[in-house]
């Protein structure tokens, strides 16, 4: 019988080609310039505003030993706080897109604010004690000056900003899958059938079948090793039938011969007492496999 490509169980042919692995390609995002100067300007602006709001606290406290009541005064700290606020405003303006940067002026104002604040702290009147707000404002102004100076050094190139880490697209495009390679025999048939696209040197010149003994058919249908022209599979050959035997052989090999091949024996006929002439006769030979019996005369010797 013949299997056509439409029948169930027929394997689907796979495309031939070279097998390629998956090659994911990740798209690099634009690194751009370092954002460290922008972060430093933000720090300058925030610290200047924090120093300004902290200056509303008790900077100096009037001592009670002089007979005065407890009171909080600002002393000479107004100027350093004003300078720090100006530096914060200039740094904030530089954050606006396409705005001119005044990083040099901001750095100068930051350092100037630190010097003025230190001078006001140590030159306080003897009747006043230092309040908690003075130390907070001094800390904010010092950190503001440090950030302003770092921004100036990065802007001028004295300090190299760290290179930003390369960013990859999390949804990168993947390469195309290659086709499956050729492994000698093309798919499309049963039991080692060769494909139609196989090289001519590897194809079989004709059907090759193992020799079968004469008179016996193959138990299984033979399969042709050459590809069919339609490419639909193998055609099974019906088993050969054994030749018919002659009538004479069938008559000799009838029911007298069991399946084992040994001759069958039947019991001898009973001898009656009244027949004296046959009492001394020899027994009949029943071992003839051909089934014929030879007659013997009464009293004669067996043949």
Swiss-Prot record:
This is 34 kDa antigenic protein homolog. Residues 194-207, 215-255, 287-303 have a biased composition (Low complexity). GO terms for cellular component: peptidoglycan-based cell wall; plasma membrane. It is a multi-pass membrane protein. Coiled coil: none annotated. It is found in: Cell membrane. Residues 256-271 have a biased composition (Pro residues). Keywords: Acetylation, Cell membrane, Membrane, Transmembrane, Transmembrane helix. The modification N-acetylthreonine is found at residue 2. Disulfide bonds: none annotated. Residues 194-303 are annotated as: Disordered. To M.paratuberculosis 34 kDa antigenic protein. Pfam families: DUF5336. The chain crosses the membrane at residues 42-62, 77-97, 102-122, 134-154. Residues 274-286 have a biased composition (Polar residues). It comes from Mycobacterium tuberculosis (strain ATCC 25618 / H37Rv).
């Amino acid at each position: 019988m013949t299997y056509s490509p439409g029948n169930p169980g027929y394997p689907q042919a796979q495309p031939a080609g070279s097998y390629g692995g998956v090659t994911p390609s990740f798209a690099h995002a634009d690194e751009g310039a370092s954002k460290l100067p922008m972060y430093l300007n933000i720090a300058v602006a925030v610290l200047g505003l924090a120093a300004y709001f902290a200056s509303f606290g008790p900077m100096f406290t009037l001592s009670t030993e002089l007979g005065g009541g407890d009171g909080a005064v600002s002393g000479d700290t107004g100027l350093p706080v004003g300078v720090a606020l100006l530096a914060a405003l200039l740094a904030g303006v530089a954050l606006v897109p396409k705005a001119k940067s005044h990083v040099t002026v901001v750095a100068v104002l930051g350092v100037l604010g630190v010097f003025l604040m230190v001078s006001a702290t140590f030159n306080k009147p003897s009747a006043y004690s230092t309040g908690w707000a003075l130390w907070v404002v001094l800390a904010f102004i010092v950190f503001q000056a440090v950030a302003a100076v770092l921004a100036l050094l990065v802007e001028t190139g004295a300090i190299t900003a760290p290179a930003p880490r390369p960013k990859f697209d999390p949804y990168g495009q993947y390469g195309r899958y290659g086709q499956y390679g050729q492994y000698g025999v093309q798919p499309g048939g049963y039991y080692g059938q060769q494909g139609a696209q196989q090289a001519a040197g590897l194809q079989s010149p004709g059907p090759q079948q193992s020799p079968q003994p004469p008179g016996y058919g193959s138990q299984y249908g033979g399969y042709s090793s050459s590809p069919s022209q339609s490419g639909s599979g193998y055609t099974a050959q019906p088993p050969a039938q054994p030749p018919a035997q002659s009538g004479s052989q069938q008559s000799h090999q009838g029911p007298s011969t069991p399946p084992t091949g040994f001759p069958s024996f039947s019991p001898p006929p009973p001898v009656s007492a009244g027949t004296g002439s046959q009492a001394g006769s020899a027994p009949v030979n029943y071992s003839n496999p051909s089934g014929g019996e030879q007659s013997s005369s009464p009293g004669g010797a067996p043949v």
